[in-house]
From Swiss-Prot:
Catalyzed reactions: (2R,3S)-3-isopropylmalate = (2S)-2-isopropylmalate
One GO molecular-function entry: 3-isopropylmalate dehydratase activity
InterPro entries linked to this entry: 3-IsopropMal_deHydase_ssu, Aconitase/3IPM_dehydase_swvl, AconitaseA/IPMdHydase_ssu_swvl, IPMI_Swivel, LeuD
Species per Swiss-Prot/TrEMBL record: Cellvibrio japonicus (strain Ueda107)
Record-level GO cellular component terms: 3-isopropylmalate dehydratase complex
The protein's Enzyme Commission number: 4.2.1.33
Pathway(s): Amino-acid biosynthesis; L-leucine biosynthesis; L-leucine from 3-methyl-2-oxobutanoate: step 2/4
Gene responsible for this protein: leuD
Quaternary structure and partners: Heterodimer of LeuC and LeuD.
Protein name: 3-isopropylmalate dehydratase small subunit
Length: 215
Protein backbone atom coordinates (compact mmCIF):
# COMPACT_ATOMS: atom_id res chain seq x y z
CA UNK A 1 0.00 0.00 0.00
CA UNK A 2 1.20 3.52 -0.76
CA UNK A 3 2.26 5.54 2.25
CA UNK A 4 0.72 8.92 3.00
CA UNK A 5 2.85 11.60 4.63
CA UNK A 6 2.36 15.07 3.11
CA UNK A 7 0.16 15.88 0.12
CA UNK A 8 0.14 19.18 -1.73
CA UNK A 9 -2.75 18.59 -4.09
CA UNK A 10 -5.17 20.30 -6.42
CA UNK A 11 -8.71 20.20 -5.03
CA UNK A 12 -11.83 19.27 -7.01
CA UNK A 13 -15.49 19.45 -5.92
CA UNK A 14 -18.20 16.86 -5.41
CA UNK A 15 -20.72 19.40 -4.24
CA UNK A 16 -23.66 17.22 -3.27
CA UNK A 17 -24.66 15.36 -0.12
CA UNK A 18 -25.25 11.62 0.27
CA UNK A 19 -23.04 10.50 -2.61
CA UNK A 20 -23.38 6.72 -2.46
CA UNK A 21 -20.99 4.01 -3.58
CA UNK A 22 -23.09 3.19 -6.65
CA UNK A 23 -22.60 6.78 -7.76
CA UNK A 24 -18.87 6.52 -7.07
CA UNK A 25 -18.51 3.29 -9.08
CA UNK A 26 -21.68 1.81 -10.66
CA UNK A 27 -22.51 -1.83 -10.07
CA UNK A 28 -21.81 -3.03 -13.62
CA UNK A 29 -18.09 -2.39 -13.12
CA UNK A 30 -17.69 -4.57 -10.01
CA UNK A 31 -16.75 -7.84 -11.72
CA UNK A 32 -13.00 -7.41 -11.29
CA UNK A 33 -11.29 -8.09 -7.96
CA UNK A 34 -8.15 -6.26 -9.02
CA UNK A 35 -7.67 -2.85 -7.44
CA UNK A 36 -6.70 -1.12 -10.67
CA UNK A 37 -8.59 0.00 -13.75
CA UNK A 38 -11.59 1.56 -12.00
CA UNK A 39 -10.51 5.19 -12.32
CA UNK A 40 -11.88 5.58 -15.84
CA UNK A 41 -15.34 4.70 -14.54
CA UNK A 42 -15.26 6.81 -11.38
CA UNK A 43 -18.58 8.71 -11.17
CA UNK A 44 -19.38 7.12 -14.55
CA UNK A 45 -23.04 8.12 -14.66
CA UNK A 46 -22.11 11.73 -13.92
CA UNK A 47 -19.02 12.02 -16.12
CA UNK A 48 -20.49 10.55 -19.30
CA UNK A 49 -23.74 11.06 -21.20
CA UNK A 50 -24.11 7.45 -22.32
CA UNK A 51 -24.49 4.29 -20.24
CA UNK A 52 -21.16 2.73 -19.37
CA UNK A 53 -20.56 -0.96 -19.97
CA UNK A 54 -17.95 -3.33 -18.53
CA UNK A 55 -14.70 -3.56 -20.52
CA UNK A 56 -15.80 -0.60 -22.63
CA UNK A 57 -13.15 1.88 -23.74
CA UNK A 58 -13.92 5.37 -22.45
CA UNK A 59 -12.12 7.01 -25.35
CA UNK A 60 -14.68 8.78 -27.50
CA UNK A 61 -17.52 8.47 -25.02
CA UNK A 62 -19.61 11.68 -24.84
CA UNK A 63 -18.61 13.71 -21.78
CA UNK A 64 -20.97 15.59 -19.52
CA UNK A 65 -19.40 19.02 -19.86
CA UNK A 66 -21.28 20.27 -16.79
CA UNK A 67 -19.63 17.75 -14.44
CA UNK A 68 -16.70 19.37 -12.57
CA UNK A 69 -14.21 16.51 -13.03
CA UNK A 70 -14.46 17.14 -16.77
CA UNK A 71 -13.48 20.80 -16.35
CA UNK A 72 -9.87 21.56 -17.41
CA UNK A 73 -9.27 23.43 -14.13
CA UNK A 74 -9.77 20.26 -12.09
CA UNK A 75 -7.66 17.87 -14.15
CA UNK A 76 -5.05 15.98 -12.10
CA UNK A 77 -6.82 16.77 -8.82
CA UNK A 78 -5.74 14.62 -5.88
CA UNK A 79 -8.01 16.06 -3.16
CA UNK A 80 -11.78 15.65 -3.40
CA UNK A 81 -13.96 18.12 -1.49
CA UNK A 82 -17.29 16.50 -0.67
CA UNK A 83 -20.42 16.98 1.38
CA UNK A 84 -21.98 15.09 4.28
CA UNK A 85 -22.50 11.32 4.34
CA UNK A 86 -20.07 10.68 1.50
CA UNK A 87 -19.75 7.00 0.56
CA UNK A 88 -23.14 5.85 1.84
CA UNK A 89 -24.94 2.85 0.37
CA UNK A 90 -23.48 -0.61 -0.20
CA UNK A 91 -20.16 -1.65 1.29
CA UNK A 92 -18.28 -2.17 -1.98
CA UNK A 93 -14.53 -1.72 -1.54
CA UNK A 94 -14.37 -0.85 -5.24
CA UNK A 95 -15.39 2.72 -4.28
CA UNK A 96 -12.06 3.68 -2.67
CA UNK A 97 -10.29 1.63 -5.36
CA UNK A 98 -11.88 3.83 -8.04
CA UNK A 99 -11.02 7.07 -6.23
CA UNK A 100 -7.43 5.95 -5.73
CA UNK A 101 -7.05 4.70 -9.30
CA UNK A 102 -8.33 8.04 -10.62
CA UNK A 103 -5.63 9.84 -8.64
CA UNK A 104 -7.31 11.01 -5.45
CA UNK A 105 -5.28 10.56 -2.26
CA UNK A 106 -7.67 12.26 0.15
CA UNK A 107 -11.37 13.07 0.51
CA UNK A 108 -12.49 15.92 2.77
CA UNK A 109 -16.10 16.00 3.97
CA UNK A 110 -18.18 16.85 7.06
CA UNK A 111 -19.06 13.16 7.48
CA UNK A 112 -18.63 9.74 5.86
CA UNK A 113 -20.52 6.47 5.84
CA UNK A 114 -18.79 4.16 8.33
CA UNK A 115 -17.92 1.24 6.03
CA UNK A 116 -16.60 3.49 3.27
CA UNK A 117 -14.59 5.43 5.87
CA UNK A 118 -12.94 2.21 7.11
CA UNK A 119 -12.29 0.92 3.59
CA UNK A 120 -10.43 4.12 2.69
CA UNK A 121 -7.77 3.50 5.33
CA UNK A 122 -7.24 -0.06 4.11
CA UNK A 123 -6.46 1.25 0.63
CA UNK A 124 -4.15 4.18 1.33
CA UNK A 125 -6.84 6.84 0.93
CA UNK A 126 -7.11 9.47 3.68
CA UNK A 127 -10.68 10.50 4.60
CA UNK A 128 -10.71 13.75 6.58
CA UNK A 129 -13.70 15.00 8.53
CA UNK A 130 -13.89 18.75 9.05
CA UNK A 131 -16.65 20.89 10.48
CA UNK A 132 -19.32 21.73 7.91
CA UNK A 133 -18.59 25.46 8.18
CA UNK A 134 -14.93 24.81 7.35
CA UNK A 135 -15.89 22.63 4.38
CA UNK A 136 -18.21 25.41 3.19
CA UNK A 137 -15.28 27.83 3.38
CA UNK A 138 -13.03 25.49 1.38
CA UNK A 139 -15.68 25.16 -1.31
CA UNK A 140 -16.05 28.94 -1.56
CA UNK A 141 -12.31 29.48 -1.82
CA UNK A 142 -11.90 26.69 -4.38
CA UNK A 143 -14.65 28.04 -6.64
CA UNK A 144 -13.17 31.55 -6.41
CA UNK A 145 -9.59 30.54 -7.22
CA UNK A 146 -8.55 28.36 -10.15
CA UNK A 147 -5.69 26.03 -9.27
CA UNK A 148 -6.78 25.88 -5.61
CA UNK A 149 -4.43 23.55 -3.73
CA UNK A 150 -4.55 22.13 -0.23
CA UNK A 151 -1.59 20.94 1.81
CA UNK A 152 -2.38 17.92 3.95
CA UNK A 153 0.18 16.95 6.60
CA UNK A 154 -0.75 13.63 8.17
CA UNK A 155 1.94 13.70 10.86
CA UNK A 156 0.76 17.12 12.04
CA UNK A 157 -2.90 16.33 11.24
CA UNK A 158 -3.48 19.61 9.45
CA UNK A 159 -5.11 20.86 6.26
CA UNK A 160 -3.61 24.16 5.07
CA UNK A 161 -5.11 26.49 2.47
CA UNK A 162 -3.16 28.60 -0.05
CA UNK A 163 -3.53 31.60 2.29
CA UNK A 164 -1.77 29.70 5.07
CA UNK A 165 -4.83 29.05 7.22
CA UNK A 166 -4.65 25.63 8.87
CA UNK A 167 -7.34 23.33 10.20
CA UNK A 168 -6.67 20.34 12.43
CA UNK A 169 -8.34 16.97 11.99
CA UNK A 170 -8.68 13.85 14.13
CA UNK A 171 -7.45 10.40 13.18
CA UNK A 172 -7.06 7.16 15.10
CA UNK A 173 -3.42 6.62 16.10
CA UNK A 174 -3.27 3.10 14.66
CA UNK A 175 -4.72 4.17 11.32
CA UNK A 176 -2.31 7.09 11.23
CA UNK A 177 0.62 4.72 11.79
CA UNK A 178 -0.56 2.44 8.99
CA UNK A 179 -0.96 5.28 6.48
CA UNK A 180 2.35 6.93 7.35
CA UNK A 181 4.14 3.61 6.83
CA UNK A 182 2.06 2.25 3.94
CA UNK A 183 0.86 -0.76 5.90
CA UNK A 184 -2.19 -2.74 4.82
CA UNK A 185 -3.29 -5.96 6.55
CA UNK A 186 -0.54 -7.96 4.82
CA UNK A 187 2.08 -5.34 5.63
CA UNK A 188 1.06 -5.37 9.29
CA UNK A 189 1.40 -9.15 9.38
CA UNK A 190 4.85 -9.01 7.77
CA UNK A 191 5.96 -6.56 10.48
CA UNK A 192 5.53 -9.48 12.89
CA UNK A 193 7.22 -12.06 10.63
CA UNK A 194 10.11 -12.72 13.06
CA UNK A 195 7.71 -13.30 15.96
CA UNK A 196 5.53 -15.56 13.82
CA UNK A 197 8.52 -17.67 12.79
CA UNK A 198 9.74 -17.84 16.41
CA UNK A 199 6.31 -18.99 17.56
CA UNK A 200 6.15 -21.67 14.86
CA UNK A 201 9.60 -22.96 15.81
CA UNK A 202 8.68 -23.06 19.51
CA UNK A 203 5.33 -24.69 18.82
CA UNK A 204 6.94 -27.35 16.64
CA UNK A 205 9.31 -28.21 19.50
CA UNK A 206 6.53 -28.27 22.11
CA UNK A 207 3.99 -30.24 20.07
CA UNK A 208 5.74 -32.01 17.19
CA UNK A 209 2.77 -34.33 16.66
CA UNK A 210 0.75 -31.41 15.33
CA UNK A 211 3.18 -31.09 12.46
CA UNK A 212 3.41 -34.77 11.51
CA UNK A 213 2.40 -35.33 7.92
CA UNK A 214 0.07 -38.26 7.33
CA UNK A 215 1.34 -40.33 4.42
Amino acid sequence: MKSFTVLDGLAAPMDRANVDTDMIIPKQFLKSIKRTGFGKNLFDELRYLDEGKPDQSCEGRPLNTEFPLNFPRYQDASVLLARENFGCGSSREHAPWALDDYGFRSVIAPSFADIFFNNCFKNGLLPIMLDEKIVDQLFREMYASEGYRLNIDLAEQTVTTPSGESFGFEIDAFRKHCLLNGLDDIGLTLEKADKIRAYETRRRAEAPWLFDVVK
